[in-house]
Amino acid sequence: MIIHSDWHIHSEASYDSRLPIKEIEEKSLEYGFKKIGITDHLNFNDEKFVGDLKRSRELLSNLQKHCDRAVFGVELTPIEKPMFDYIKKHGNYEGYIAPVSQNPYEIELAMTKDELRALGVRYAIGASHWRVDVTGGKELGDDLNACIKEWYRQQMWLVSDERVTVLGHPWYNGRGLWYEDFSIIPRAMKDELRAALLENKKYAECNSHFFNSTLTGEKFRHQYAEFLRELFEAGIPITYGSDSHNSYKPAHVNTEKYLLEVGFADGDIKGIEECDLW
């Protein structure tokens, strides 16, 4: 066993999860995890998502009364700055119309670091999920080259932001656009992202999705494990995230198989150090 903690778990407080906090506690103990990080989504700065985060905090507070393995985190995703500003003014995004722009929209995250800390959050996973460079980016997810360019832009932005502790699921794509062959992502982009992670002293996540999803085949899984190994050998600490949503399965078992094949050993997959928690 080389994975001893899980820093990316979604509880029943997340809009897209039904995973009871009790199941997380019991299963993580069964798996031998020394630390578990609850990282429910804070996609937008609206009342709904802020309310979800407060519920997550309440669940964690109750859990921490008898479980010292649990850490309160959050998952942040890049959103377009004009939408952030609109929500800040109106409280939600109903009626929002994206402005016409010839350039990619500026990026923002839903809360400041001080706001997150005030709620008790101790670390943040920053992760790309959809395009925010153009109007209707969520619906424009099939343009391979545009998506690669936008994911690169977002991830480079995330690793330079003070709120991000861990770069979550690097190069994840919900539609699996480049999942047949990871070499589709230009080598220069991978190299520059690695350099930025190192320069900004960020963690990179080994997400179980890449090794367990039906979207990924054997070729991609081996390529992705090698990518993680390159990050590790460059001096970037690697955390593990199951990214569990609706059930807490032992996804780490299959994930470890691919990590071991590229040279990962016990002690290589890290937890977040206390000095890096808020």
Tell where the protein language model's regions lie, with residue ranges:
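A metal-dependent hydrolase metal-coordination microenvironment
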Residues: I2-R153, G241, H245-K249, Y258
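Structural motif
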Residues: Y31, L119, D161-E162, A234, ...
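Divalent metal-binding pocket/active-site signature
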Residues: R18, L119-A196, N200-E218
